[in-house]
Amino acid sequence: MQGSDIGFAPIKIDSGDDIYVISGVSGQLLKVDKNLKPLADICTPFPALITSSTILGNIWIGVWIERDLRQARMAALDLTDDWSNGPTKSDLRDYQSGFSLHPSSNVWSQILDSEPTALSQVDESICFSTINRGIYKIDGESNEIWRAEIPKWSEIEKINTFDEIVAFLSYEEQLVLMSKAGGFAIIDENGNLVQKGVLKLPEVITGFQYEKDLGWFIKLNGKCFATLSSLTDSPKIYKVLGPVYDVKNIQGEWFWTGWRHDGKLTKEGKLITESRENIGIGIVGGNVLTNDGIWEKIRV
């Protein structure tokens, strides 16, 4: 499937066990398998930008935001179902019906009055944040498990208005969250704050990953990324050609794709990069999906 065109401009790939969901700039969705074979036709369940999404077991959960029409939804779609096209933007513009419309093929859907960010799969649940409201943990059926206040960090309080949580992940039977400005917190299973701190970084955090044997990989919004063995360590900064958009642990080494380059960090700590003429959006196996919707082999 290398060199094939998926048919739209992608913005993200969500990874499941044996299935991947590609989302597009206009709300398109496409399911593919590990061999990059499409499992169904492209569909647009809701006519809005998908701002956050993840996979939990056999469901894909997404957040759709249409800011001009002030419409927002969070919904779950069963990965084993056939998905279909939903309402159009003209349907949403009809004020009388707009607020009753939901993404098609959903197993549950909610109308939102605030924008969730950092939608993340954490063990058998979903965590997300809402700006200036709190952090939440829900199950796969949208039942609330707990909610808590967003941690505050005195070191970065001057920019608190512009800060937001970027992601959550499972870490040693607890969960870790990070904010754009470098704040991190460890939360226990009941939503209680265990530890917090601030990472000193040269750029804004856009995402992060953790692997027991590799430590932490911190994605930044400029021409750097960072690694740490422990959250209490000083970050090690690496310079690259542009932002990293997706990173994977492949055979015990960090591999990534991003703005105009692919890269890897070897077991010995050697940084290797190869330039590309386009932008890498996501990785499946040894393949990169570019911003123009083409599958290519990773270049490192």
What residue spans do the PLM features occupy?
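Intrinsically disordered, low-complexity segments enriched in Gly and acidic/Ser/Thr residues
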Residues: 192-274
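Repeated scaffold domains used in trafficking and secretory/extracellular systems
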Residues: 5-17, 44-59, 106-107, 111-121, ...
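WD40 beta-propeller repeat fold
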Residues: 8-11, 22, 26-33, 38-57, ...
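Per-blade loop-tip surfaces of WD-repeat and WD-like beta-propellers in eukaryotic adaptors/scaffolds
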Residues: 35, 80-83, 101, 139-149, ...
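A short beta-strand motif characteristic of beta-propeller blades
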Residues: 1-5, 37-43, 103-111, 144-159, ...
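Short beta-strand elements that form the blades of beta-propeller/WD-repeat-like
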Residues: 11-24, 30, 53, 57-68, ...
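Asp-box/WD-like beta-propeller blade repeats and closely related beta-sheet repeat scaffolds
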Residues: 86-116
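Structural motif
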Residues: 26-32, 68-84, 133-138, 181-187, ...
